[in-house]
């Protein structure tokens, strides 16, 4: 495959698969590299890498003297076919330790929170807020931020509890046979003046 390379006056490089230089593509390394350490892997124009993160973003800030500081610590992102995706770990890792887990472009994690930051944890399944064993949004320092969701539907704490722990139906024993209140009402309605079967 023919490779087209663009290099600017600072030394930033971009690799393309087409002569018009519109489709970023490189098979043996990042298709975009900047002198400050930014690296993006592309396959046929889509962010994509199977053997590691597809995006390294330098962490930079301006210090109190107005000087731009660029750290080696980076925001790291995994992509597959242009979508944030990683199996077995977070798809995005921030320099401060915050993480987000994605599966084929959707926030998703089955064994813990899909979003972890300094203020809260959030549980997602297939892009929807969802947690069975507690609040789907959990405040780390402030429990008042806790929010309960099932399949992206907001519930109160009590509604969430009752959804997973429905009240048991009470039965009424008549002549050794147990009837729920609904069953007993149905029998009475069916009998309509006739004798009941017990």
Model-flagged regions — what are they?
Residues 1-178, 183-198:
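Glycine/tyrosine- and acidic-biased, solvent-exposed loop/turn segments at the edges of beta-strands
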């Amino acid at each position: 495959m023919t490779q087209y390379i663009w290099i600017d006056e600072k030394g930033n490089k971009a690799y393309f698969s087409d002569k018009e230089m519109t489709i970023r593509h490189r098979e043996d390394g990042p298709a975009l590299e900047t002198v400050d350490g930014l690296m993006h892997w592309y396959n046929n124009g889509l962010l994509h890498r199977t053997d590691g993160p597809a995006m390294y973003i330098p962490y930079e800030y301006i210090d109190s003297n107005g000087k731009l500081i660029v750290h080696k610590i980076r925001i790291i992102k995994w992509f597959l076919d242009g979508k944030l995706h990683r199996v077995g770990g977070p798809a995005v890792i921030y320099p401060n330790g915050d993480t987000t887990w994605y599966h084929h472009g959707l926030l998703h994690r089955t064994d813990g929170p899909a979003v972890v930051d300094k203020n809260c944890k959030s549980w997602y399944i297939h892009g929807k807020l969802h947690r069975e064993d507690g609040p789907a949004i959990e405040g780390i320092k402030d429990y008042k931020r806790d929010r309960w969701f099932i399949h992206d539907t907001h519930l109160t704490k009590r509604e969430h509890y009752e959804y997973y722990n429905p009240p048991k139906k009470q039965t009424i024993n008549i002549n050794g046979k147990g009837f729920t209140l609904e069953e007993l009402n149905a029998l009475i309605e069916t009998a309509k003046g006739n004798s009941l079967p017990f």
